[in-house]
């Protein structure tokens, strides 16, 4: 076709467009962006150029992004603190940023791990048998709730009333 050029990503004007597409879908870490661009088949030099362009435009900022993701996890009320930490670290955020974001967001939201775990236990109704309790315990532990808390809710203190 005359008048149409196929984008190869090599033109200066096209640099950053792939990164912007990834970032438009959701908040991602710099490491997550690099991985997504690599999976798209871009060579290392192009990945670096895309990341630099995104940084220069101000749309790639791990400190801002990890805080947004931490806030969503806290508001989702489905994970314990360790589960939220694991999720953020697996997304490629640096440990120091994850710790700071979780600390700040948890304090701001006055989030309490016990109350979140109690909500989840109430929603599922604690099974009367040991096998059912063990299944519920595995679910809570897999979501990053503290083992002492799970033990207290399911065996020691009994199910929360509500």
PLM segments and residue spans:
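An alpha-helical, amphipathic repeat domain used for nucleic-acid recognition
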Residues: 1-162
């Amino acid at each position: 076709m005359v008048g149409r050029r196929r984008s190869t990503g090599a033109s200066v004007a096209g640099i950053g467009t792939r990164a912007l597409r990834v970032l438009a879908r959701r908040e991602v870490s710099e490491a997550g962006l690099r991985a997504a661009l690599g999976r798209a088949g871009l060579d290392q030099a192009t990945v670096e150029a895309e990341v630099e362009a995104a940084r220069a435009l101000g749309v790639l900022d791990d400190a801002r992004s990890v805080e947004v993701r931490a806030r969503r996890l806290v508001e989702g009320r489905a994970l314990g603190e360790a589960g939220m930490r694991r999720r953020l670290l697996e997304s490629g955020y640096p440990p120091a940023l994850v710790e700071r974001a979780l600390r700040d967001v948890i304090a701001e939201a006055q989030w309490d791990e016990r109350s979140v775990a109690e909500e989840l236990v109430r929603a599922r109704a604690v099974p009367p048998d040991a096998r059912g309790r063990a299944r519920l315990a595995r679910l809570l532990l897999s979501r990053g709730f503290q083992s002492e808390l799970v033990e207290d809710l399911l065996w020691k203190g009994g199910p929360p009333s509500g």
